[in-house]
Amino acid sequence: YIQYLERLRIPQKVAIKDMSKGNKVKINLAVALAHNPRLLILDEITGALDPIMRDEILKLFLEFIQDETKSILFSSHITSDLEKIADYITFINKGNMIFCKEKDDLLCTYKLGICRDSKFGKLDKQGIVAYYKDESRVVFLLDDSIGNGVEHKEVILEEPTIEEIMLVLAKGVIL
């Protein structure tokens, strides 16, 4: 336990009630890790932390899961944390599971497309999973395994981030 307090730089002579929200999160994590669990279930564990401490916590998580008998299940709105350490991602929106996939498979499944609204109306929609309109442009997800030959100088296709995939699927019209 003391090892985790020191590693997470938790002040040991400050009453818990006087600690910052970030230090309270870290002390809860230290208590959980000190019990040598096989499974950590965490809710928004990195949300109250500054970027430097968040990075330290993520490194600690990576060390924890190097032992293949151990796992972490955590919810997060910080998708960059998921990109750094997740093996599997489950996206739940408004109580519905939208997907549950291996992170690498998820990132290889789609292309993110961006074009003008007028151009989108003329595109073949085969392979387009979802889209949303944003001012004068349309942002869409293209299932890369199906593809549809969407290549045009007026259409930008790029590798999406997890956040972009989630945004289009949550905000967009599903085809």
Predicted segments — roles?
Residues 129-175:
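C-terminal coupling/interaction segments
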Residues 8, 110-113, 169-173:
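Alpha-helix boundary/capping residues
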